[in-house]
Amino acid sequence: MNDNLKSFLDQKVAQYNRPEFIANDPVSIPHMFTKKQDIEIMGFWAATLAWGQRVTIIKKCRELITLMDGAPYDFIINHEEPDLKKLLHFKHRTFNDIDTLYFIAFFRQHYENYDSLEDAFVPSNKSVILNDSEGSIREYALQQAEGDPTVETALNYFRSYFFSLPDFPHRTKKHVSSPSQKSTCKRLNMFLRWMVRNDNNGVDFSIWNKLKPADLICPCDLHVDRVARHLKLITRKQTDWQTAVELTEGLKELDPLDPVKYDFALFGLGIEERWGIEGIMPEF
């Protein structure tokens, strides 16, 4: 372990893992709610729409909340067909009304059967049979017989489950990634961080417990990737799922129980301090 690096990053975690930074971050969207299902729905949606400028992301999420009458869970469960008309013009970048309506359809069928979105990632029963995105039948054994589920298993399961409704729009598949596609799954890993981490600092929610903080994979976006490479936490040339795993394994050397807390440090250095864009980056 590099003690100097750990000390430096721990200081940066303390600097950026604070409620003062919530307002300007997409995590502010689920923080608008107290009902668990509203937090899950808008946390997932905010993470999905999290590309581009943060001001725009937050603005579009607030627009979506307004279109759902300020109560996403209630709207999704109780809406009637005419209620969906006002959503037909919602768009953020390549996310459009077709995607919006499918998200609502998925959430409705899920919450009619489960109390929490957590079951969409780690079902309560040992194995689940469902129609996968190619229309064939698969069985997902979620490692609960031999041990705890992994994030990789959970994300691969989630994508197949998410697109298990009949006649799902194929265009929407680009908005939900998975490790099996070699994606870093940055947005989904960020969402899982929000739902799972439990440091009581008031940023992450800690409303899920089937996955542990030690299981999480660090979200790896352009800014985190740039900083992590300078710190030699990433050596892999390409940026894919294995890159996110490599980064997380390096962070586990600093804190094996909560490696993803360093997302605050890496992201803060990349965005707030513009490491790699402005100024001189120290060596460790």
For each of these PLM feature ranges, what is it?
Residues 1-284:
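HhH-family (HhH-GPD) DNA N-glycosylase catalytic core used in base-excision repair
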